[in-house]
C-alpha cells in the first residue's frame, strides 16, 4: 500500500468513537503507516488498536499508549478529539470550562514534546475556543492549528439537497462562518442548485429560515436520533483536513482558523479557508448585509466565550498572549 507520507500522525482521544473512526479513516485513505493512538482510558485505546491490527492494513505501524510523552514525541501531525462529548440537552458552550482545561494541557504537551509538529486539528467542543486555548498554549503559528467547522456547511448543503431533491454534490456555495455553535452565521446568498442560483429556485423565506435552523441544530438532532454525538462525519472531515496538510488534495470547506485583522480580533472562527501543505489560509467572507451582520454577532459571541476562559485563568489576558506564544 502506498502512503502519502511516512511521518508520525498522533490521534488524541483514540479510544472514543470519533478517535477510532479517525484511525480507521486515516489508514483507509493511506495517509501514513505510522499512527500513534493515544487516550487516557487504557482499555478503550488498547481495544481500538487491536481492531486496527485485525483490519490487516498493509505496511501499517500502529502503536498505542496512555503516556503523553510517547504519544506526542516526534509527532508531525496531530488530530485531537480528546474532550468530553456533548450529550442530549447540552449546547457546545456547556462544555466550555472542562474541555478548555483539557485543551490547555494538550497545547502544553505540544510545546513540550513536539514543537516541530507541522499541523494540528482540534475537534472537541466548543471547538473555536478549545482550539484557541490549544494555540495559545502550544506556541504554534496560527496557520499550523485549525479547528473542525466543515460539518455546519455540509449540513446546510445536505438540507438544501433534500429540499430540492438533488444529489448533495449538486449544491454549491453552501457555507457557514463564525462560530461552530448556536451562533453560527449561515451564508446562503451564493448557493447554487445544479448551477442555478438559490434566489431563482422559489424557496420561501419561511422555508429558508427552517433550513437554517435545521442546520444550526444538526448536531443536536443527531444526538436525539442516535443517542450520542456525531462521530463519523467529524472523523472523516478532520482526517481530510490533515490529509491536505500532508500534501494531499487541498481542503476547501470552511475551517476554524485564528483571525486577527481590522474587523475581527484574537479569535478562532470559521472562515473561507484553504488548507494545504503550507498551512491554513483564509479570506474574508462575501455575503449580504444580513449575512455579514450574523457573522458580526457570531464574532461577538466568540469574544464572550474567549473572555470567559480568560476570567477562569485557563488562558492569560489577550495582551499577554505573546508571553505564551510569540507567534500571536
Language model features with spans:
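A short, basic/flexible loop-to-alpha-helix module at the beginning of a structural domain
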Residues: 1-7
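Conserved glycine-rich cofactor-binding loop
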Residues: 15
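Conserved S-adenosyl-L-methionine
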Residues: 28-34, 139-142
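Rossmann-like NAD(P)(H) cofactor-binding subdomain of soluble oxidoreductases
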Residues: 91-159
Amino acid at each position: 500500500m502506498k502512503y502519502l507520507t511516512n511521518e508520525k500522525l498522533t490521534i488524541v482521544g483514540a479510544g472514543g468513537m470519533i478517535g477510532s473512526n479517525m484511525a480507521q479513516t486515516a489508514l483507509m485513505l493511506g495517509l501514513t503507516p505510522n499512527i500513534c493512538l493515544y487516550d487516557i482510558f487504557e482499555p478503550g485505546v488498547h481495544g481500538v488498536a487491536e481492531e486496527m491490527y485485525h483490519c490487516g492494513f498493509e505496511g501499517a505501524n500502529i502503536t498505542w499508549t496512555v503516556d503523553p510523552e510517547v504519544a506526542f514525541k516526534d509527532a508531525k501531525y496531530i488530530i485531537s478529539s480528546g474532550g468530553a462529548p456533548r450529550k442530549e440537552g447540552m449546547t457546545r458552550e456547556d462544555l466550555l470550562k472542562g474541555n478548555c482545561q483539557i485543551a490547555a494541557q494538550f497545547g502544553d504537551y505540544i510545546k513540550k514534546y513536539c514543537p516541530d509538529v507541522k499541523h494540528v486539528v482540534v475537534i472537541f467542543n466548543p471547538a473555536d475556543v478549545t482550539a484557541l486555548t490549544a494555540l495559545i498554549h502550544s506556541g504554534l503559528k496560527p496557520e499550523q492549528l485549525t479547528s473542525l467547522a466543515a460539518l455546519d456547511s455540509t449540513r446546510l448543503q445536505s438540507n438544501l439537497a433534500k429540499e430540492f431533491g438533488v444529489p448533495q454534490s449538486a449544491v454549491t456555495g453552501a457555507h457557514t462562518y463564525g462560530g461552530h455553535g448556536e451562533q453560527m452565521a449561515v451564508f446562503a446568498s451564493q448557493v447554487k442548485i445544479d448551477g442555478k442560483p438559490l434566489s431563482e429556485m422559489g424557496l420561501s423565506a419561511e422555508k429558508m429560515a427552517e433550513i437554517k435552523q435545521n442546520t444550526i441544530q444538526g448536531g443536536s438532532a443527531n444526538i436525539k436520533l442516535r443517542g450520542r454525538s456525531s462521530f463519523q462525519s467529524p472523523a472523516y472531515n478532520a482526517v481530510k483536513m490533515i490529509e491536505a496538510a500532508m500534501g494531499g488534495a487541498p481542503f476547501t470547506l470552511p475551517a476554524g482558523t485564528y483571525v486577527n485583522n481590522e474587523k475581527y480580533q484574537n479569535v478562532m472562527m470559521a472562515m473561507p479557508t484553504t488548507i494545504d501543505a503550507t498551512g491554513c489560509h483564509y479570506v474574508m467572507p462575501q455575503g449580504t448585509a444580513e449575512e455579514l451582520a450574523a457573522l458580526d454577532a457570531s464574532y461577538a459571541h466568540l469574544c464572550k466565550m474567549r473572555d470567559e476562559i480568560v476570567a477562569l485563568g485557563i488562558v492569560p489576558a489577550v495582551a499577554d498572549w505573546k508571553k505564551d506564544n510569540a507567534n500571536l
